[in-house]
């Protein structure tokens, strides 16, 4: 298990640069009330069809507790990406606890639309 002990099932894993952009976007989404925190809420947004992108933590223990999300994302055609740290994701979500999954939701007339679109394209490049 090379690569700092990150589970190989955590694919696609964002690099440092993309991780930073994702964390910034998550923070802004929180400010605009376009963020759902946690695996269960992320699942709900996918089922309701209101999710733009799913961000998951690669260091979730055990990782299997959120591996249903990539399958659901593929069914719903929603991009998803892993970041290295659940603690960093928690901080970006504005909570003191670690967060293993977050969903950025759709909002008509949102100021984040262009940023979300750009990040989606970057994430989709990882899958190629």
From Swiss-Prot:
Coiled coil regions, renumbered to chain: none
Gene Ontology CC terms, in alphabetical order: box C/D methylation guide snoRNP complex; nucleolus; precatalytic spliceosome; small-subunit processome; U4/U6 x U5 tri-snRNP complex
Secretion signal span: none
One Pfam assignment: Ribosomal_L7Ae
Function: Binds to the 5'-stem-loop of U4 snRNA and may play a role in the late stage of spliceosome assembly. The protein undergoes a conformational change upon RNA-binding.
The family this protein is said to belong to: Belongs to the eukaryotic ribosomal protein eL8 family.
Name recorded for this polypeptide: Small nuclear ribonucleoprotein associated homolog 13
Native organism: Caenorhabditis elegans
Gene: snu-13
